[in-house]
Amino acid sequence: MKNIRLTVWIGIMCGWLAAGMLQAGTRPDNARPAEEDGSRLWLPVMRPVEGAEVEVIYKGKVSPTIAVAIAELKNAWKGEPVLLEKKRTGQGDGFAITSSEHQVRILSSTEAGLLYGVYSLLRMQAAGQVTVPLSVTEQSVYDLRILNHWDNPDGTVERGYAGCSLWNWEELPGTLSPRYEAYARANASVGINGTVLNNVNASPQVLATGSLEKVKALADVFRPYGIKVYLSVNFASPIQLGKLDTADPLDKEVIRWWRRKVKEIYTLIPDFGGFLVKANSEGQPGPCDFGRTHAEGANMLADALKPYGGIVMWRAFVYSPTDSDRAKQAYLEFMPLDGQFHDNVIVQIKNGPIDFQPREPYSPLFTAMKQTSMMVEFQITQEYLGFSNHLAYLAPLWEEFFGEVRPDRLKAVAGVANIGTDVNWCGHHFAQANWYAFGRLAWNPSLTSDRIADEWLRQTFTSQPAFVRPVKEMMLQSREAVVNYMMPLGLHHQFAWGHHYGPEPWCSVPGARPDWLCLLYTSPSPRDRQKSR
């Protein structure tokens, strides 16, 4: 009963919030200004800055990134003059903010770091945390903080619940939507510095020359915001695109084909990030098709990328069609390969051993592999947590993970994006909080869910305590509510077949994998579980 009351209470609170916004004068969606329709996210609306009274000082050539930083300050800063200064403050894109009665100084070794410092200052202003003197020093825990888009060439998004793909491939490279820059701005504001543009179930055509020219157009938009582009690649591309007879990673012609293709990419996009690969999983081709290991496949691609500084993110989401317990499959396949991957390969592992369930133990690979670079893959889109219909604040899920897996065990962090063409970007206003929380935790995994929710609410809606306090409480309890109704008694896979929305504990599909069916987990005896097969 307690769980039912909590769920009903959350629904009532959502209704109260909506009613309150309407009473405040909110018009229907198709008539709302940007301040109210969700399109501005948690950021100030950008307005013309000509004649702005804010004084920003930068002694040096104003690059596109510095121009963005200056524009953000002139648009929203309400304090003393700001000095931006490139000065060594630590490694990577860290920054320092200091102040006196007459000036605020933002220092960083990099231009991207200065931009992050600007967004941090504006975040503190929105939260009412700017005091004199200021003394803030921040350093990102992970150098790579990457969104993974499961976007397809036809404009659909796998497990997407916020409209169509943000990327209008048919209009690129000639037409650039203003949302591309707005997307880059939102990512930079929370420290996200990379994006994989396409689905891990990748089409070989993404590597065709015409497609790469479209990717270049996006990379050019994102670059001033410190964001690199990456691509998911199909391991069989040498066969399907290059017309070779094989994709064997040890074949000389295959190696030559990949090296030529990588050279073509870097000629167009000098700061290209690298490849994300889903191989030998759910029907996708991979090195195992040719009697090779995951390490041999990943290393071949890594060798092609290394002269340009590129990386390979090789997914560990694999399971054998003949084994009924997929929870152990990634461990069985990757643990024997520990220490065999090249230094520019990162094994990308889902946070849990099953598949983004509302609650899972962490994957054992995170603590077992000692000689391999690893990164965690979270799912920001709510495949198993109510799509974009349910309020489910996911920071507690990720905070739970970082409480078990030491951040220094990881090299990078990835999140499967929840972004689409909906006017509010994420299909549900509160789903924006998960995009925001992912970026903040990827920058600093020691942040609390409470603090992140507080930041997001104050920047997105209002700082009034009468609003922030109850709505934050609702957010902080929402994930546990989803766990209780999606995983009763800790049982997973009680959801509907295929789309994963809503309950279907009676599900029985002839010929389906036993571990995809509810009966495997709910039947009282081995004999009954056998019937699910």
Regions found by a protein language model. Give the residues of each.
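Bacterial N-terminal signal peptides
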Residues: 9-20
